[in-house]
């Protein structure tokens, strides 16, 4: 598998414009990225632009705080699928995890998994920068129990992004059959190679073109 096919080509800034989405989808077609990862408002346009392409549309759910109710997250998923999303990256209820309310964390993830079942792949963002190692392990275990397809490190909107150490811990926790996505601060081919070596099977990056072309990113982004 080429590096491009492991990358979710990402544009999640709040000031993202239509022109930027058109560029993103054009680049996805050109380079063969796994997906474009966009905010829900851009799902329909992205799906139209990628009709017939190998790249699919990924969107974010309960993003970036994870503090919506399970019911709201489930509605977001259904709306996104209706608009053409094939993958959804949800943020867990981080406060509930900190409170050791594992039942709520699981119910929250399961609401998204159930809403997406058979229609979209689910990635669960655990926001590693806010968690202890014990909490990272617990979050991954709950996500697997709830039926996720992937676990993912970060939103790119908090205090830190992906590290090889966290990827290795997540991979060890979920085993070989669940995907692990590194996201947040992955900007170069060298960064990607480190993450893959640690166990990542998907990369979230706004610098996708720079990564596959070997060029330096125009400016650093956290996601």
UniProtKB/Swiss-Prot annotation:
Might you give the EC number(s) for this enzyme?
4.1.2.4
One of the protein's GO biological processes: deoxyribonucleotide catabolic process
Pathway as given in its UniProt record? Carbohydrate degradation; 2-deoxy-D-ribose 1-phosphate degradation; D-glyceraldehyde 3-phosphate and acetaldehyde from 2-deoxy-alpha-D-ribose 1-phosphate: step 2/2
Task: Tell me where it mainly resides.
Answer: cytoplasm
Cellular location(s)? Cytoplasm
Q: For this UniProt record, give its keywords in alphabetical order, as a comma-separated list.
A: Cytoplasm, Lyase, Schiff base
Concerning SUPFAM superfamilies, the annotation shows: Aldolase
Active-site annotation: 89 (proton donor/acceptor), 152 (schiff-base intermediate with acetaldehyde), 181 (proton donor/acceptor)
> Reaction catalysed by this chain?
2-deoxy-D-ribose 5-phosphate = D-glyceraldehyde 3-phosphate + acetaldehyde
Family that this chain belongs to: Belongs to the DeoC/FbaB aldolase family. DeoC type 1 subfamily.
Q: What does this protein do?
A: Catalyzes a reversible aldol reaction between acetaldehyde and D-glyceraldehyde 3-phosphate to generate 2-deoxy-D-ribose 5-phosphate.
Q: What is this protein called?
A: Deoxyribose-phosphate aldolase
Q: Which organism is it from?
A: Listeria monocytogenes serotype 4b (strain CLIP80459)
């Amino acid at each position: 598998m080429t590096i491009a096919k492991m990358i979710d080509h990402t544009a999640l800034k709040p000031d993202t414009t239509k022109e930027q989405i058109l560029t993103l989808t054009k680049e996805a077609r050109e380079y063969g990225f796994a997906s474009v990862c966009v905010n829900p408002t851009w799902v329909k346009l992205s799906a139209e632009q990628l009709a017939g392409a190998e790249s699919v549309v990924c969107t974010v759910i309960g993003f970036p705080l994870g503090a919506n109710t399970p019911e709201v997250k489930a509605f977001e998923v259904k709306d996104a699928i209706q608009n053409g999303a094939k993958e959804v990256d949800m943020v867990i209820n981080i406060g509930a995890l900190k409170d050791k309310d594992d039942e709520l964390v699981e119910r929250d993830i399961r609401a998204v998994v159930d809403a997406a079942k058979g229609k979209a792949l689910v990635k669960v963002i655990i926001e590693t920068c806010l968690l202890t190692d014990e909490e990272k392990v617990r979050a991954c275990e709950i996500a697997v129990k709830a039926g996720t397809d992937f676990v993912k490190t970060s939103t790119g909107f908090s205090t830190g992004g992906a590290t090889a150490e966290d990827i290795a811990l997540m991979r060890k926790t979920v085993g070989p059959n669940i995907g692990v996505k590194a996201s947040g601060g992955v900007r170069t081919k060298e960064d990607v190679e480190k993450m893959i070596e640690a166990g990542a099977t998907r990369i979230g990056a706004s610098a996708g073109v720079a990564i596959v072309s070997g060029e330096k990113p125009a400016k650093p982004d956290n996601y």
